[in-house]
Amino acid sequence: RNDLYAGYKDGAGMEEAILLQIPVMEDALTAAGFTVWPMVTHEADDALGAAAAVADADERVEQVLIVTPDKDLGQCVRGDRVVQFDRRKREILDEEGIIAKFGVGPRSIPDYLGLVGDSADGFPGLPGWGAKSASAVLAVYGHLEDIPPAAGQWEVPGLRGAAKLSATLQSQLELAVLFRRIATLDRILGGRLTVNIISSD
């Protein structure tokens, strides 16, 4: 993701003393019985998404709880089987909860973030596109490529500024697609994961 977009978050600014503690922390967690997955080309969110997908596919697992408030993890939610938990707000979001919060379903979350951006990950989205406009348009069309090129073709009731939004999208569609790619989690991770691997029991 850093190679795709220069503004994407990185470890810059992290004190060297903290960086030096990471291997020590990994060893301590492993010794305590926790599963540790050191990664170079992937991030923690990819690992969470991959683990959730593996657990979802295992019939022995009753429910998958993804414990993070990060917006991009919303794409992993499925029905009430794979849910997202924000422990600060004590809020559990199933698929209906994701729709209520963002105005779009889990499959459209990367497209949504491609339009509005994600400040936590360091990409801005498109100018003029906010949460309301993105959710209104994507609730109808689902994905960036399915949005008609001309605002006159849009069937989005009550949307203001459609012409300007459409012009911005058409002129910066490649950028929106790039941001969507950044927001899309790798939930396969080379097929290396199993429930037995991700379990600390």
Language model features with spans:
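Noncatalytic, basic helical substrate-engagement surface that gates or grips nucleic-acid strands
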Residues: 1-67, 72-83, 87-92, 175-178, ...
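Non-catalytic nucleic-acid-binding/docking modules located in mid-to-C-terminal regions
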Residues: 14, 34-35, 60, 89-201
